[in-house]
Amino acid sequence: MRDFVLGPIFLAIAAYGLAHPWVGIMGWTWLSIMNPHAYSWRLSSMPVAAAIAGATLLGLFLTPDRREFFVTRETVVLMLFMLWMCITLPFSYDFDHSYPLWNRVMKIDLMVLVAMCVLYSKKHIIMLAWVLAGSIGFFGVKGGLFTLATGGSYRVWGPANSYIEGNNEMALALIMIIPIIGFLRFTTNSIWTKRGLVVAMLLCAAAAIGSQSRGALLAIGAMTTVLWWRSDKKFFLAILLVVVGIALLSFMPESWWERMGTIGTYKEDTSAGGRINAWWMAWNLAKANFFGGGFAVAKAELFAMYAPDPTQVLAAHSIYFMVLGEHGFVGLFLFLMLWFFVWGSAARLRVQGKKLPQTLWLSYLGAMCQVSLAGYAVGGAFLSLSYYDLPYNILILVVLGCRWLDGKEWVTEEAEHAKQQAAIEAKSALKERSLRPYAKP
């Protein structure tokens, strides 16, 4: 049954993406973030994402419905980072395992660049935010209800065979999407939609807490701190956050509190000790190898050479040490520079967007993207999500928002809207005149 529902949807997206590549980008984002085809039977083993990506790339050259590629500091650094990963690939310690991972990352980054060519309007930006919110929010609403129904006794897991399959990764994705849902709440005028989005945000928070991820708890703390600091109503927001926090935490069982309590005693925790050991391995590996070790460095041989404790072979579990171990200090420098620039551009949107009523929505976009990135920066310090799609889609939102602001696109869009309205009114008037001879006296 799922195949019969999802199959026509995928075909329609691919077909429509040929004429309108922006539709293909929305479909690709939906597939890469939510992984819906994994819930079907036969479609789960078919290259659905590749088909939609191929149709989108072909449509990019066939249709004028696009903008010329524009150069920003973010796009330049992203392409340099991609180039550096291509340079480090031949020097990988385990090329056979590194190549599939490199191929996956290149596809994601390529579609990020394509998205910045075919998405340009306010409608595109808001629609992309809706796709992201719906894709992750689906798991948040479902997981939040599950957490409340079970009293937090069980962990919330992500979709299988995806970047966010684990409970920790799922929690970070949920935390990062909450500010994006908050931005969408500002863009809608429907009171019921606003209320529904508030409920979705609360359920996403419940699901993130229910994942029993210690990194997620730290990320929530970082996000709420940024949100509170930026608020004009700090006292009211502080009370609201405390009330909501107490309400959500009251559902958590004793096992949750015991696990969160290990944050302060990380030296006694074997899991934390294994991660620190992996971080030292990545540091020593990068010092000894200028190009890093490639995409697959969680190897016993490498830990034997570079780790303080060679018996604990674990992935880096940190976006920073992951890049450091895989691509060396140059790769880490480019990675940090990329997100530093994205943060700065989001700050510019937040400040400059307040100057005009037409750009006020961009101020909220920049502010919420910064809150989301704060969660990624803190929560990602304990997770291997350096190449996960969601933060790169936030990059797209920020870059497109800056382009819309700098190009004063609201002038063009308002003129286009007025032109369309005039055409509709003229068509209605013409139809009315054509019916007059047949009107009854």
How would you label these PLM feature ranges?
Residues 1-3, 43-50, 101, 162-175, ...:
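Membrane-interface micro-motifs in multi-pass membrane enzymes
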Residues 153, 157, 161, 264-327, ...:
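Long extracytoplasmic/lumenal interhelical loops at the membrane interface
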Residues 37-41, 158-170, 270-274:
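Short aromatic-rich membrane-water interface segments that cap or initiate transmembrane helices
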Residues 1-87, 93-96, 100, 122-130, ...:
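Transmembrane signal-anchor hairpin modules in multi-pass inner-membrane enzymes, especially those
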Residues 8-17, 55-57, 82-90, 107-111, ...:
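Alpha-helical transmembrane segments of multi-pass inner-membrane proteins
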